[in-house]
């Protein structure tokens, strides 16, 4: 297997630049954009583990900090779902302009609060986003009107021991009209720190994206 190509990127937003890591294996079959939870970053070991498994399955990945360093120092900003949603949309637009990713079908992987931003962004993108996976997500933080507009296949992964978040996800399923599946990971708490649980998340996410991201092209390089 050939190694993935890695590129550190800087993406312009309204208040400056945000940074990310774009990696694509040869003949990538799709691109997954990651939205991490509050207090985390693109260096999140959990998201990077999932991203590595996705690349092994032939998918390109883009892990990005949706806030500038200055914004991230303000605690309340980490929970500003409209801002995080707009940033994810900015990243999506940027990815569609890059030769490495322009032709690839796209999906979102959101963790915790990042899942709310991923769902809201998917709602506004319509058919432009082909699939969403949420890990321990907080769909309750997304506006109800956005949940009602999510049409793409969505996989909600929640730990069996994460009782509060599990209840929130069960409620969200009832408000989402698109194909939505809630999978409970046995023995897992919110951070999926228990042996084998994060591996299960990565496998389930890879299977979901492989099923729902149709082949449309292969990358040639990024700017």
Model-derived segments and spans:
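Catalytic active-site module of serine/aspartate enzymes centered on a nucleophile-bearing elbow/loop
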Residues: 188, 196-223
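A conserved short beta-strand
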Residues: 127-139
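Catalytic histidine neighborhood in serine/cysteine hydrolases
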Residues: 176-191
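Serine-hydrolase catalytic machinery in alpha/beta-hydrolase-like enzymes
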Residues: 8-104, 191-196, 200-201
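Short beta-strand/loop motif that positions the catalytic acidic residue
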Residues: 150, 156-158
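Short beta-strand immediately N-terminal to the catalytic nucleophile in serine-hydrolase-like folds
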Residues: 107-110, 135
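Gly/Ala-rich beta-loop-alpha elbow adjacent to hydrolase catalytic centers
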Residues: 109-118
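Conserved alpha/beta-hydrolase "acid-adjacent" motif
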Residues: 163-168
